[in-house]
Amino acid sequence: VAISVDVVIKIEQDAYLKRITDQADMVLVDGKPLIWISKLYKRPVKAKISGSDLVPKLCEKAAEKGYTIFIIGGKDGIAEQAKRKLEKQLSGIKIVGTYAPPYGFEKDKNELDKINQMISDVHPDLLIGCFGCPKQEKWIYENYKKYDATVSVCAGATVDFLAGNIRRAPGWMSDHGLEWFYRFTQEPKRMFKRYFVDDIKIVSLMWKYRK
């Protein structure tokens, strides 16, 4: 699970998501603001590692070691586009499946059974789930024992980055905590509420948990 300011806000409002996060095998800090806050609290986190940083590295290692990958999520055709791009970039990569579930799939038992069987049929070493928070976290938590995949990773918009559908912020912007602004300039309508309404709540949470 990768924790950004947005995810912190969601965890504060969703006890179930908090429980899922607490039980995750790996939790990453995805966002410079959280690094700064950790230093302010004198409990510094060593580094920012976002899902979009981690997943390409995992794909490189998978190609090197011969591990298999399944990509699920994104709009129709995006996961397949990411597959084709990765196959051009990484010699030897084995992407054994992609799927873009329909809207509301997480509430459809037949669709969930279909997805779990689809994954189990190819038993990937790495499952990359890209539905956004909290859908991806809840789906993996509720289904990882029902499908056959060795490792499952929550990756959010990473499928769009892998496909080249959305460009990542330049390194200097990420290093200075401005990746959010770059994302906003790319998708202002979709991102306005997140960055200028929801995420502002982090200020009150900083005060609430100041001790």
Short names for language-model regions:
Residues 25, 96, 125, 150:
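Conserved acidic residues
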Residues 83, 137-146:
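Short Gly/Thr/Asp-enriched flexible loops that form oxyanion-binding sites at enzyme active sites
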Residues 33-38, 168-211:
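A transmembrane-helix-recognition feature enriched in membrane-embedded lipid enzymes
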Residues 116-128, 133, 149:
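Proline-aspartate-enriched helix->loop->beta-strand connector
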Residues 4-8, 131-136, 158-159:
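Short glycine-rich anion-binding loops that position phosphate/pyrophosphate groups of nucleotides
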Residues 1-53:
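N-terminal nucleotide/polyanion-binding subdomain common to many enzyme families
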Residues 41-118, 122:
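Conserved beta-alpha
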Residues 100-106, 148-186:
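Short, flexible loop segments at boundaries between secondary-structure elements
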